[in-house]
């Protein structure tokens, strides 16, 4: 019984990896059908549906992986790092680095791969980015409590500016067919961003 569950889990992971790889390839710029995915995995469409009730559930699983990966690591950054600008820099670098290592998933993060899918998938991605923006805002607010001085501009505006930078870099990555890496020249860009905060 345990072996059967392990095989099923491995097949599920294989299907999700194939979907992520297809999103990374030229197929990712078009709608991915279950027929194409099944052919890529080397199984029938019926076999896909034994592991996932729908393509939406496959995307749900990939979004869950994105959410878990980012939120877990952001929480570790917040736990381990206390200096405001280092926290912000590490969170942005985390998002950009994750996207760079997972180009197919970046198409999901930007919503590009979800254009032809159910609206609730895009809603999940929107909620993820809203949570990240909220965490950035909280880091900025804690700076005022910790150091006794705030920023010249409202924390909400600053948090949205930082997140907009990330989203812009992810969009550029997709638009360039993954030529322009999101972390490219980050060490030069970060001081410019940090200067805007003061």
From Swiss-Prot:
Residues 33-52 bind DNA. Residues 9-70 form the HTH tetR-type domain. Disulfide bonds: none annotated. InterPro entries: DNA-bd_HTH_TetR-type_CS, Homeodomain-like_sf, HTH-type_TetR-like_transc_reg, HTH_TetR, NO_SlmA, SlmA-like_C, Tet_transcr_reg_TetR-rel_C_sf. GO terms for cellular component: bacterial nucleoid; cytoplasm. One of its GO terms (biological process) is cell division. The keyword NAD does not apply. The keyword Ubl conjugation does not apply. Its main location: cytoplasm. PROSITE patterns: HTH_TETR_1, HTH_TETR_2. Residues 113-144 form a coiled coil. Belongs to the nucleoid occlusion factor SlmA family. Homodimer. Interacts with FtsZ. PANTHER family: HTH-TYPE TRANSCRIPTIONAL REGULATOR RUTR, NUCLEOID OCCLUSION FACTOR SLMA. This is Nucleoid occlusion factor SlmA. It comes from Pectobacterium carotovorum subsp. carotovorum (strain PC1). The lineage of its organism: Bacteria, Pseudomonadati, Pseudomonadota, Gammaproteobacteria, Enterobacterales. The gene is slmA.
């Amino acid at each position: 019984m345990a072996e059967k569950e392990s095989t099923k889990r491995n097949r599920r992971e294989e299907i999700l990896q194939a979907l992520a790889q297809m999103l990374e390839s030229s197929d990712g710029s078009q709608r991915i059908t279950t027929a194409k995915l099944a052919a890529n995995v080397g199984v029938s469409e019926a076999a896909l549906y034994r592991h996932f009730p729908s393509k939406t559930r496959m995307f749900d699983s990939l979004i869950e992986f994105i959410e878990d990966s980012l939120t877990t690591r952001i929480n570790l950054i917040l736990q381990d790092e206390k200096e405001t600008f280092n926290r912000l820099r590490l969170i942005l670098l985390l998002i950009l680095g994750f996207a760079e290592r997972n180009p197919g998933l970046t198409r999901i993060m930007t919503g590009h791969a979800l254009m032809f899918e159910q609206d609730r998938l895009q809603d999940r991605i929107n909620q993820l980015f809203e949570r990240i923006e909220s965490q950035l805002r909280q880091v900025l607010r804690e700076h005022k409590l910790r150091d006794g001085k705030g920023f010249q501009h409202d924390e909400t505006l600053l948090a949205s500016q930082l997140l907009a930078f990330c989203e812009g870099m992810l969009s550029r990555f997709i638009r360039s067919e993954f030529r322009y890496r999101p972390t490219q020249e980050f060490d030069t860009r970060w001081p410019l961003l940090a200067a805007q905060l003061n």
